[in-house]
């Protein structure tokens, strides 16, 4: 027990953030787009609320990647990113990064890093450096493939709902368009009630069943029994993560191959 307390709120609602602020609040922590429903938080608004209460704004930027979204330019004080995902991009490294434009915070973080020893090995560092050379190329392709698939799936008869910030008319679209260069390679799809998610994901050939994301290969998983299985079902359902939800990490493969694979998987249901 480190003595840290927190209040969980929907950060997409700036009024909810404001209402949750207390005298001892030191940080507003958010993830945008969120996992697994791809909800988008207005970073500028969230940071403004935090700063009005002398707190810092910390953004997990993993789903977006720094190519698509630069939270420091939007008022955030600290940005976190999993280097295992888009920064590494090849599913062959485990790493994480903390970035800040505040020199005082940077010195404090560096002191913790030196004291605890949580630094990357030379091999992990090499793999991430290698991957950064192709970050723009990869993320552009992730963006293109994901938007095309989301648009197609949005009209599919066996899909109840598509969660992707790049779809016009969705609640997150205008904010995402304003603060993101591209909408990213992550999406979630909700099958029609009664359809078997296990059968669907196991029928796929190009999409691989795995919990990770952000690599060049397309991955797919079922949050209810994989990434979010430890969350009690009633809490999971309260937060919109239904049994029929499938999370998709769209890779850089040929778009027609990806579409054909999803189509044959859905046709088999």
Positions of PLM-derived features:
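Positively charged, small/polar-rich N-terminal and surface patches that mediate targeting and assembly
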Residues: 161, 214, 220-221
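PLP-dependent enzyme catalytic core of the Aspartate aminotransferase-like
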Residues: 2-5, 23, 195, 202, ...
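Conserved small-domain helix->loop->beta segment predominantly found in fold-type I
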Residues: 147-211, 233-237
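Short, flexible turn/loop "capping" segments at secondary-structure junctions
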Residues: 89-90, 122, 179-181, 238-243
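A common structural junction motif
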Residues: 116-117, 204-214, 265-269
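Conserved PLP-enzyme active-site core in the AAT-like
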Residues: 1-158, 163
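Short, well-ordered beta-strand elements within core beta-sheets of diverse protein domains
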Residues: 128-137, 184-192, 247-251
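Short, solvent-exposed polar/charged micro-motifs at secondary-structure junctions
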Residues: 17-19, 171-176, 219-224
